[in-house]
UniProtKB/Swiss-Prot annotation:
UniProt cofactor note: Binds 1 Mg(2+) ion per subunit.
Signal peptide extent: none
Family indicated by similarity: Belongs to the PanB family.
Organism expressing this protein natively: Coxiella burnetii (strain CbuG_Q212) (Coxiella burnetii (strain Q212))
Record's protein name: 3-methyl-2-oxobutanoate hydroxymethyltransferase
Entries under InterPro entries matching the protein: Pantoate_hydroxy_MeTrfase, Pyrv/PenolPyrv_kinase-like_dom, Pyrv_kinase-like_dom_sf
Positions with a binding annotation for 3-methyl-2-oxobutanoate: 45-46, 84, 113
Catalysed reactions listed for this entry: 3-methyl-2-oxobutanoate + (6R)-5,10-methylene-5,6,7,8-tetrahydrofolate + H2O = 2-dehydropantoate + (6S)-5,6,7,8-tetrahydrofolate
Keyword Transferase attributed: yes
This protein's UniProt keywords: Cytoplasm, Magnesium, Metal-binding, Pantothenate biosynthesis, Transferase
SUPFAM superfamilies for the chain: Phosphoenolpyruvate/pyruvate domain (SSF51621)
NCBIfam families to which the protein is assigned, alphabetical: panB, PRK00311.1
Catalytic EC class: transferase
Length: 266
């Protein structure tokens, strides 16, 4: 039984209880998360970068997303799972875009997430919500628009940009999103948006006043020692711990310490 549902997001904001979300891409990681207190899981299109080594999220496809959603849903059947709509999958004709939504939902997602709030997206979100499918919005740094934005940069620093973000947030809430991600926006702006809309905000690089926080599992575990954006706290030095385990294995194999005849052999 899934421990969380869409009304819980609204209730938690109303009760001033923070929402914890972790981005996860695979079965074994999901198994661990399933035993944790983390509220929900995002299967993000960032898997194109984290799992496949691309420099952007753009190479993620609907089929790749569906495969990873299936793996995560098998590992964490008790968690609320959000699936990212990948690059251009919701910018096509309505039938094709809805086929993409259907694929992700049938793969095991309980909701979808998409980036931006232009007229096309708002119309599509309205249709998806009216179809009975929960939607999370995403504003601020929207990685699928990385070439338009000019890189991975903080958004909403200028007054005009901040005003637009506020308007977009209100539009997403009014269109029917049940929550939204705010990525890499100034803390004060994120706080204003959070207090100005009825739905919860999930921050990443958006300060402490959002309704919750999301981090990529590999980032919070510190498995990439080359990645240290300002917003990231590494809750474990995973890189060094994993490297040490590998070096210890290598050493024991080469010294014939492992496998031990009495302990590890049949």
């Amino acid at each position: 039984m899934i421990a969380m549902n869409t009304p819980d997001f609204q209730r938690m904001k109303k009760d001033n209880k923070k929402i914890s979300m972790v981005t996860c891409y695979d079965y074994w990681s999901a198994c661990i998360i399933s035993q944790s207190n983390v509220d929900c899981i995002l299967v993000g299109d960032s898997l194109a970068m984290v799992m496949y080594g691309h420099s952007t999220t753009l190479p993620a496809t609907v089929e790749i997303m569906a495969q990873h959603i299936q793996a995560v849903s098998r590992g964490a059947p008790n968690k609320f799972i959000i699936g990212d709509m990948p690059f251009c999958s919701y910018r096509k004709d309505l039938t094709t875009s809805m086929n993409a939504v259907e694929r992700l939902m049938q793969a095991g997602a309980q909701a979808i997430k998409l980036e931006g709030a232009d007229a096309h997206n708002l119309k599509f979100i309205h249709h998806v919500v009216k179809s009975g499918i929960p939607v999370i919005g995403h504003l601020g740094l929207t990685p699928q628009s990385i070439y338009t934005l000019g890189g991975f940069k903080v958004q909403g620093k200028e007054p005009s940009a901040a005003k637009k973000l506020m308007a977009d947030a209100k539009a997403l809430a009014e269109t029917g999103c049940f929550a939204m991600v705010l990525e890499c926006v100034p803390s004060e702006l994120a706080e204003l948006i959070t207090h100005s809309i009825s739905i919860p905000t999930i921050g990443i690089g958006a300060g402490p006043a959002t309704s919750g926080q999301v981090l990529v599992l590999q980032d919070l575990l510190g498995t990439n020692n080359q990645f240290q954006p300002k917003y990231l706290k590494k809750f474990l030095n995973g890189f060094e711990l994993i490297k040490k385990a590998l070096d210890d294995f290598d050493q024991e194999v080469k010294t014939s310490t492992y496998p031990h005849l009495e302990t590890h052999c049949y």
